[in-house]
Regions:
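Short, small-residue-biased leader/transition segments that mark boundaries at the very start
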Residues: 1-6
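N-terminal subdomain of lithium-sensitive/metallo-dependent phosphomonoesterases centered on the IMPase/IPPase/PAP
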Residues: 10-107, 247, 269, 276-279
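Small-residue (primarily alanine) positions within well-ordered alpha-helices
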Residues: 29, 33-36, 135, 154, ...
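Residue-level signal for inorganic ion chemistry
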Residues: 40, 65, 76, 110, ...
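Short secondary-structure boundary/capping segments
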Residues: 52-53, 77, 92-95, 137, ...
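Generic detector of well-ordered alpha-helical packing
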Residues: 66, 70, 89, 106-109, ...
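DPxDG-like acidic metal-binding loop motif
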Residues: 96-157, 170
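An extended, acidic
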Residues: 162-282
């Protein structure tokens, strides 16, 4: 117990030190993400209790999602009242300044959360004139805070992030998302999955795309691809990977990631190889 208290003290001191190094804008985002994350962590404990109840946790999780989104909306609106919003739960709020828009996923990994699996995150990104300029991904279960600003690098807590340096697909572990009932073209995905399985060291499916992208930025995953994504899923993670020295494109090799709802990411070599592999003819 004493060791846990000491670790928390060190962590809190590191966060305070980092607050001094971050921009005022990023600090606002961090505070909003961590406040929402603490709310989710409390709710997650209750979800685990509801797993064994007759009612089940479904309604409670929906409330937790909305609570987290409201916390973020309140915090960011207070700090930057002229900025717009694009939120997973509440949709779009037009900006007053015509330039800035927050992209918010208050609970990425909802299904994991619902089933008591501690793999979920809060994701916040800021668009300025259509370009992502700042991003925060917070994993409450592991108390991992990922941050990035355009031109300022990407960080996990106080550690600078770099994408993995592997240069062969055969040595790489690749993340993906698997389409479920009523979503995505399963036949096309199975072809892509078969191709990637045949050329890599392994495939991981975390169920929280924001964390997948953060893991690519930090070198835990060598690459990632998925279809059917939304701006709030991808915004923060795209910036983190680029600021960590990685490459990101849509499945056509272009930059219309939000338009195509597709993403392929990794270091320069792995990203190109993964792009080629998933696009192999049937």
């Amino acid at each position: 117990a004493i060791r846990d208290v000491y670790k928390r003290q060190l962590r809190d001191r590191a966060y305070k030190d980092n607050e001094m190094a971050r921009s005022a804008l990023l600090n606002v985002m961090v505070q909003a993400a961590m406040k929402a994350g603490r709310s989710l962590a409390r709710d997650f404990g209750e979800v685990q209790n509801l797993q064994v109840s007759l009612k089940g946790p479904g309604d409670y999780v929906s409330q937790a999602d909305r609570r987290a989104e409201q916390i973020i909306y309140t915090e960011l609106s207070r700090a930057r009242p002229d900025y717009g919003f694009l939120m997973e739960e509440s949709g779009e709020v037009e900006s007053k300044d015509g330039q800035h828009r927050w992209l918010i996923d208050p609970l990425d990994g909802t299904t994991n959360f619902l089933h008591g699996i501690p793999v979920f995150a809060v994701s916040i990104a800021l668009e300025r004139q259509g370009q992502i300029v700042a991003g925060v991904i917070y994993n409450p279960a592991m108390d991992e805070l990922y941050t990035a600003e355009r031109g300022g690098g990407a960080f996990l807590n106080d550690r600078r992030l770099r994408v993995a340096s592997r240069n062969k697909l055969v040595d790489s572990v690749i993340g993906t998302g698997i389409p479920h009932l009523g979503r995505g073209h399963h036949g096309h995905y199975l072809v892509e999955l078969r191709n990637v399985m045949a050329e890599t060291a392994g495939i991981r499916r975390m169920g929280a795309v924001a964390l997948d992208l953060a893991y690519v930025a930090g070198g835990r995953l060598d690459g990632f691809w998925e279809d059917g994504m939304h701006p709030w899923d991808l915004g923060a993670g795209i910036l983190m990977i680029r600021e960590a020295g990685g490459f990101v494109s849509d499945k056509n090799g272009g930059q219309d990631i939000f338009g195509t709802k597709t993403i392929v990411a990794g270091n320069e070599i792995i990203q190109k190889a993964l792009l080629k592999t998933i696009n192999k003819p049937i």
